[in-house]
Amino acid sequence: MNTIVFNKLGGAVLFEDRGTPDRERGSRTFSGFLDNPHTGPEVGIPDGPPLKDNLSLRHRRTGARQNGGKVRHKRQALQDMARPLKQWLYKHRDNPYPTKTEKILLALGSQMTLVQVSNWFANARRRLKNTVRQPDLSWALRIKLYNKYVQGNAERLSVSSDGDSCSEDGENPPRNHMNEEGYSTPAHHTVIKGESSAIKAGGRPESRAAEDYVSPPKYKSSLLNRYLNDSLRHVMATSTAMMGKTRRRNHSGSFSSNEFEEELVSPSSSETEGTFVYRTDTPDIGSTKGDSAANRRGPSKDDTYWKEINAAMALTNLAQGKDEVQGTTSCIIQKSSHIAEVKTVKLPLVQRF
């Protein structure tokens, strides 16, 4: 009699009926195999605990991957938060001690608390001192030399962003400072000299454009020269007009009192134009010594011309005097091209016979 046994995989296994002894022997063998506890591992049937260990290892590996991603994300977030602090530290590398107001602004910009900002700067200064172990160095030199002295996986003070990029190893200067100094307009020649010396020292070609600008002193001097030239033309024109009026009056023979007063009051005889008219009174003139002394007061262009005019005026006044014993006359003395002197003198007149 045949017996059909269905295994777990759904396949049919056919056993032949060999008799009772064979059946008992087969049943013993099968039962012995099931009853023996040491036969399990040899066949390769896994027990419960090894399966749990494998599952735990798998979960542990996936968890490690997830945790690694979280750590990297957290590190990147911390670097992004610390970037404004690094930028401030590099810009103020001569004195890396922010004030309370600056700490508050940095805390708002970096999404940190005020305590975190203070701790970050304290740790940064401590790292600079411990890494660059030279006692007589300034903070700026420590910051520039930090990346050369740092070892291992320690954080470096490199600042990079979209707005400005600068490395604090001392080799490349910050680009924003170079642009600010290179395109600044100089105000004086000293600024231009300072920029040229900076070009020789730092090799910045952008600041050469600063020499093309015109300094304010030159501009002011040009305006002043233009103003002085206009004023000089005006004075020369006024002086020429005054000389023409004086010559016409000299040819007429004498000044009237009204004309002389108008000459004194007129604005054309101002100090700026250099025209002076004044009057002197002398009680007596008995000889030509007074005239000669008055003529020697200032240099004249044509002394002979004016002497002849004075002599003609004296003869005219003498000829007109009939009953008078004493009279007055006017004498014009030309001091220079733009200075005239009017002198009124008393002369004894000779009676006619």
UniProtKB/Swiss-Prot annotation:
It is found in: Nucleus. One of its GO terms (biological process) is tendon sheath development. SUPFAM superfamilies: Homeodomain-like. PROSITE patterns: HOMEOBOX_1, HOMEOBOX_2. The keyword Nucleus applies. Pfam families: Homeobox_KN (PF05920). One of its GO terms (cellular component) is transcription regulator complex. This is Homeobox protein Mohawk. It comes from Mus musculus (Mouse).
